[in-house]
Amino acid sequence: FRRVLFRSERGYIEQLWREEKYHVLLHSQQSYQMIRNALKTDLSLHQVQQMIDVALLIEPSIGSVCNAFDHMWGYLKKCANEEERQQSKLLKADFINGKIDTQTLLDFLAELANKYDVQYLLQSRVLNTKRKR
């Protein structure tokens, strides 16, 4: 019986991480790595949620936003057309130069994830504003 409960909680932990990993990465690669490594141990759902909540308090840097953008773009670049690839480069450059904000980058990724039905990204809270806390 105990094993069934553990598997169930583990499933919730994996779902939570699947939904929040890019949100965490957007805020801090160090927190992302720390949580990823901690997930290899026996943590409770509550502990994982607490770690995520703490990570989300960190102010995103230009580098952390670009890193998260690049990771998510990796799921889209194969299906994106040439115009979208060019737009991706321009948007990233505009972000680095302070011409656009983080949300503009995320909206671009969300639009393409929807267009190409990239479920892995669509499950991410950072791209799914309707599910953001």
What are these regions (language model features)?
Residues 38-93, 108:
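Long, compositionally biased charged/polar accessory segments in the mid-to-C-terminal portions
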Residues 76-85, 96-101, 118-122:
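Fungal-biased detection of long, low-complexity, Ser/Thr-
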Residues 31-32, 65, 69, 88, ...:
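Short runs of predominantly hydrophobic/aromatic residues within well-ordered alpha helices
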Residues 1:
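Active-site histidine-anchored catalytic micro-motif
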Residues 9-51:
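Intrinsically disordered, low-complexity, mixed-charge
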Residues 99-130:
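C-terminal amphipathic alpha-helical interaction region
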